[in-house]
């Protein structure tokens, strides 16, 4: 092993400084070199930890969202359309859950909601519920059996929680 030159901050040809990261594992690194590495490593470690927290919280919020109670879509359909999943009453809304064509298409529905199966309508309704809450069914949402307060704009609440976690991670990674 070759000893370092007397000038630890320069390479052998004295043109390029040696990076503190290149001294990792070098037994002859000085305490000044180590404190330089610490200044670099601390924010990186804090950022990695913040990213891990955000990832974990997103996984947890997804698990919590799926673990919640399911709405009674048959009861909502009974209220909206008399339980007729093929309803076309001429009011501009279709199917058992009375979708407007624009809402149906925006949340992944294909064709006319009145021609879709009960299961297809429920799949789209679950996506609408996740984004808009029970407010999407202002008259019959209460028939779902879910507490209106919990299901009014659930995606907004999850987004707010994630933003707060990200902000806390950013604050934690700023060197003081």
UniProtKB/Swiss-Prot annotation:
Could you tell me the EC number(s) of this protein? 3.-.-.-
List the InterPro entries. Lysozyme-like_dom_sf (IPR023346), RPF (IPR010618)
**Deletion: any effect?**
Not essential, disruption of rpfC alone has no effect on growth or survival in liquid culture, nor in mouse infection models, although colony size is reduced. Alterations in gene expression are seen. All 5 genes in this family can be deleted without affecting growth in culture, however triple deletion mutants (rpfA-rpfC-rpfB or rpfA-rpfC-rpfD) are not able to resuscitate spontaneously in the presence or absence of O(2), and are attenuated in a mouse infection model.
Cleaved signal peptide residues: 1-29
Reading the lineage from the top rank, the first entry is Bacteria
Q: Which GO terms describe its biological process?
A: negative regulation of gene expression; positive regulation of gene expression; quorum sensing; regulation of cell population proliferation
List the molecular function annotations (GO) for this entry. hydrolase activity
Q: Which Pfam families match?
A: Transglycosylas
Q: Which UniProt keywords apply?
A: Hydrolase, Signal, Virulence
What triggers or suppresses the expression of this protein?
Expressed in actively growing cells, positively regulated by alternative sigma factor SigD, probably directly.
Q: Does the keyword Hydrolase apply?
A: yes
Which top class of enzyme applies to this chain? Answer: hydrolase
Q: What does this protein do?
A: Factor that stimulates resuscitation of dormant cells. Has peptidoglycan (PG) hydrolytic activity. Active in the pM concentration range. Has little to no effect on actively-growing cells. PG fragments could either directly activate the resuscitation pathway of dormant bacteria or serve as a substrate for endogenous Rpf, resulting in low molecular weight products with resuscitation activity. Stimulates growth of stationary phase M.bovis (a slow-growing Mycobacterium), reduces the lag phase of diluted fast-growers M.smegmatis and Micrococcus luteus. Sequential gene disruption indicates RpfB and RpfE are higher than RpfD and RpfC in functional hierarchy.
Family, according to the entry, reads as follows: Belongs to the transglycosylase family. Rpf subfamily.
Task: Provide the protein name.
Answer: Resuscitation-promoting factor RpfC
